[in-house]
């Protein structure tokens, strides 16, 4: 039994195996209707709990569809239904769910909630997102890059904007997949130091460059994410926009990267804030391939967790 809690504490050979498995499964489904079951039905007779303390579109749809394509069934539970840690303890919830399901995916706020769920569950647990990390998204990002440009090892990846949870996982992935990483953004929104230290310890460059034009020089991939959350008050939104406006990914910024540099955004996006529509809809944008690949990457992760 394997839980998928983060990229940095998963063996790199297993991570590579998941990417390769995801690509094989995607290729095997080419041209088929979305509801067509996979030929081998690896999750036949399996039940998967999908816990959403934090709501989501892509995570819910991609995990739900992935389980169905592999022949399994899902039980979707919202934060209001679960009341994680408010009443019944997380530890007891994990123990109870383990009696009902074969696999748990949890999308939650606090990293501690994920870790406690994994500690007490007797079935594998998948990190669907926490405030600190978003490893499923970055596995899809690596898969997407390699579909379009070949091996990501040795490439230069630049993150522009807020050093958030996706950024943290992308730094972890730099260490595991062997690419160099540059962050450009305001000092108040730097990514966590521990992530940068981890990547450097694996022998790759993980640097901060305040000048966005210098940061993207020679980049093979430029990535950004939304500047604000749906829960942010208006005052915080305005402050963040003022901080981050110099780091908008636009055509002028992309001109400093390699001519064939890809652009990614995990979506949802606030168009013409963190990235312009010209970039998002441009020839080097792979944002919708990236969104689709959440499905395939997560199917591979589920198979790995269950040893299938």
From Swiss-Prot:
GO cellular component, one term: cytoplasm
One function term, GO molecular function aspect: amino acid binding
Pathway per the UniProt entry: Amino-acid biosynthesis; L-arginine biosynthesis; L-arginine from L-ornithine and carbamoyl phosphate: step 1/3
Keywords linked to the UniProt accession: Amino-acid biosynthesis, Arginine biosynthesis, Cytoplasm, Transferase
Record: residues binding L-ornithine: 165, 225, 229-230
GO biological process: arginine biosynthetic process via ornithine; citrulline biosynthetic process; L-arginine biosynthetic process
Catalysis performed (reactions): carbamoyl phosphate + L-ornithine = L-citrulline + phosphate + H(+)
Positions of carbamoyl phosphate binding: 56-59, 83, 107, 134-137, 266-267, 294
Main location: cytoplasm
Enzyme class: transferase
EC number(s) stated in the UniProt entry for this protein: 2.1.3.3
Localisation per UniProt entry: Cytoplasm
Family: Belongs to the aspartate/ornithine carbamoyltransferase superfamily. OTCase family.
PANTHER family to which the protein is assigned, alphabetical: ORNITHINE CARBAMOYLTRANSFERASE, MITOCHONDRIAL (PTHR45753), ORNITHINE TRANSCARBAMYLASE, MITOCHONDRIAL (PTHR45753:SF3)
Protein's job: Reversibly catalyzes the transfer of the carbamoyl group from carbamoyl phosphate (CP) to the N(epsilon) atom of ornithine (ORN) to produce L-citrulline.
Protein's recorded name: Ornithine carbamoyltransferase
Organism: Paracoccus denitrificans (strain Pd 1222)
